[in-house]
Each structure stands twice: as structure tokens, then as C-alpha cells.
Curated annotation (Swiss-Prot):
The keyword Plastid does not apply. Keywords: Activator, Cytoplasm, DNA-binding, Transcription, Transcription regulation. This is HTH-type transcriptional regulator LysM. InterPro entries: ArsR-like_HTH, AsnC-type_HTH_dom, Dimeric_a/b-barrel, HTH-Lysine_Regulator, HTH-Siroheme_Decarb, Tscrpt_reg_AsnC-like, Tscrpt_reg_AsnC/Lrp_C, WH-like_DNA-bd_sf. Residues 25-44 bind DNA. It is found in: Cytoplasm. The keyword DNA-binding applies. GO terms for cellular component: cytoplasm. Gene3D superfamilies: 3.30.70.920, Winged helix-like DNA-binding domain superfamily/Winged helix DNA-binding domain. It comes from Saccharolobus solfataricus (strain ATCC 35092 / DSM 1617 / JCM 11322 / P2) (Sulfolobus solfataricus). The gene is lysM.
């Protein structure tokens, strides 16, 4: 990833898109005091460099439960291998490889505690997972 070519304008564009990926290029251009074409070129460059990986949404449904699952793995199986398997499990929203007591942090989503438990059980069944610690998300702030 070529982060060396990132300047303050690129960082500002990323910050705007992070808050709302649907922000029109014209509004970004107005805020940065440049042309819409300049914004379009910068965003295309950020995509090409792999800095912008995807445009997505954050959502929260009523009566939906989200949890953070911290996963300990065994050193005998590479963490990326375990992470890729976890990412394929239904109900898994995102997987992070981390440092500290836990090697992997997983955000899971479900319609009830039973579905959350099912997802956690599936994570625990993956070869190389030696332990988990879970916590329910009460609120999300953006």
C-alpha cells in the first residue's frame, strides 16, 4: 500500500467519506476548495492504491444484537488462516487481527442471543481457536 503519496487533502477526503461514503464529490470539492474533477481523480487514486478498499454502510436494526468476540489462537496455526475462516461465518460482520491477550477481535451480529451464541460456537469450533471472551454491544456512537 503506497501511503507515501497521501497528503492532507487525501486525509480530509477519507475523513469525509468515512462519515458518509455517499457524500457527493461536488460537496467534497466545495469543502476542500478544489474542482469536482480533482476530487474524482484523488478518490480514483486512493482506490487504485488500495487505500480505499470499499464503500459500505454502517447500520443498526431495532432488536438486533451485536457483540465483540475476542479470540485467542494457538501459535501452531497462523492467525491469518484462522481469521479468514472466521470471516466466512454467517453473522460475522468484521474481523480484526490484534495484539495483546487476544489475537483476533470479531464483531458479530444477530437477531437474538441464540444466534449470537451460535456464531460464537462456530468460531470456537475452528481449529486453532483456544479461547474466546465475548461482550454485548449496548450502543454505537459515530
Amino acid at each position: 500500500m503506497g501511503n507515501a503519496n497521501i497528503d492532507e487533502s487525501d486525509l480530509k477526503i477519507l475523513e469525509i467519506l468515512k462519515k458518509n461514503a455517499r457524500t457527493p464529490y461536488t460537496l467534497i470539492a466545495k469543502e476542500l476548495k478544489v474542482s469536482e474533477a480533482a476530487i474524482r481523480k484523488r478518490i480514483e487514486k486512493l482506490i487504485r492504491q488500495g487505500i480505499i478498499k470499499r464503500f459500505t454502510i454502517e447500520y443498526e436494526l431495532e432488536n438486533e444484537i451485536r457483540a465483540i468476540v475476542m479470540v485467542q489462537s494457538t501459535p501452531q496455526i497462523p492467525t491469518p488462516e484462522i481469521s479468514k475462516k472466521i470471516a466466512k461465518i454467517p453473522g460475522v460482520e468484521v474481523v480484526y487481527e490484534t495484539t495483546g491477550d487476544y489475537d483476533i477481535l470479531v464483531i458479530v451480529r444477530g437477531t437474538n442471543i441464540t444466534s449470537i451464541n451460535r456464531t460464537i460456537d462456530e468460531i470456537r469450533s475452528i481449529q486453532g481457536v483456544v479461547g474466546t471472551n465475548s461482550t454485548i454491544i449496548l450502543r454505537t456512537w459515530f
